[in-house]
């Protein structure tokens, strides 16, 4: 299951639409504080403090709570920030448009320490749909609204010729994540 949120009012909209409570907790990473969000059993959000689109909107509509999913996610992040590839993935819940789900599923296949371009993702989707071409810009929009940063590795998506383009958590964090993974794109 995967979840993508299209609005700044994440918790309010989720609670109103899906009728479940949203819980949050925090992880202090070496490159900044991270907000974790869950509906109780699965991770639905992972954002750097101040990240575009998500983190500023969840404070009032969510309840801070300790949950097993936050323990699992923190363990995953501990391994990741030690410069190692975690050998498990916390349970994640992704919903959204079929297009955003497709982009998320492709991002999940990008190996640790490797990158993929927006155009390459667009080509994979075009091939899956049996069409000649898919817009790399549309892929960029979906990547930019990824609500589960790091675990769904949107930081591994780069521009044409490997150029480092925007990252909702900040380009400085994208660079730090790619350096941590010893990616050759930096």
Give, region by region, the residue ranges found by the protein language model.
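Basic nucleic-acid-binding alpha-helical/helix-turn surface characteristic of O6-alkylguanine DNA
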Residues: 9-10, 15-130, 134, 180-186
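Regulatory, non-catalytic segments
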Residues: 130-148
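Short glycine/proline- and charge-enriched loop/turn segments
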Residues: 54-57, 158, 171
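The DNA-recognition helices of helix-turn-helix-type DNA-binding domains
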Residues: 125-128, 146, 171
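Extreme N-terminal basic, low-complexity initiation segments
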Residues: 1-9
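Short Lys/Arg-enriched helix C-cap and helix-to-coil transition segments
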Residues: 150-157
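…primarily DNA-binding HTH/wHTH and HhH modules…
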Residues: 160-186
């Amino acid at each position: 299951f995967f979840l993508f949120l299209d609005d700044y009012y994440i918790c309010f909209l989720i609670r109103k639409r899906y009728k479940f409570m949203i819980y949050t907790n925090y992880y202090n990473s070496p490159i900044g504080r991270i907000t974790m969000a869950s509906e109780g059993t699965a991770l639905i959000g992972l954002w750097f403090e101040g990240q575009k689109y998500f983190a500023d909107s969840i404070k009032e509509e969510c309840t801070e709570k300790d949950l097993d999913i936050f323990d699992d996610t923190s363990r995953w992040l501990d391994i990741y920030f030690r410069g190692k590839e975690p050998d498990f993935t916390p349970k994640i819940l992704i919903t959204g448009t079929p297009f955003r789900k497709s982009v998320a599923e492709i991002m999940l296949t990008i190996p640790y320490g490797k990158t993929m371009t927006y155009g390459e993702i667009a080509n994979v989707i075009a091939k899956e749909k049996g069409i000649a071409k898919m817009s790399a810009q549309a892929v960029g929009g979906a990547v930019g609204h990824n609500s589960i940063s790091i675990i769904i590795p949107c930081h591994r998506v780069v521009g044409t010729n490997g150029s480092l383009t925007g990252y909702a958590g900040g380009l400085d964090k994208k660079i730090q994540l790619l350096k941590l993974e010893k990616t050759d794109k930096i």
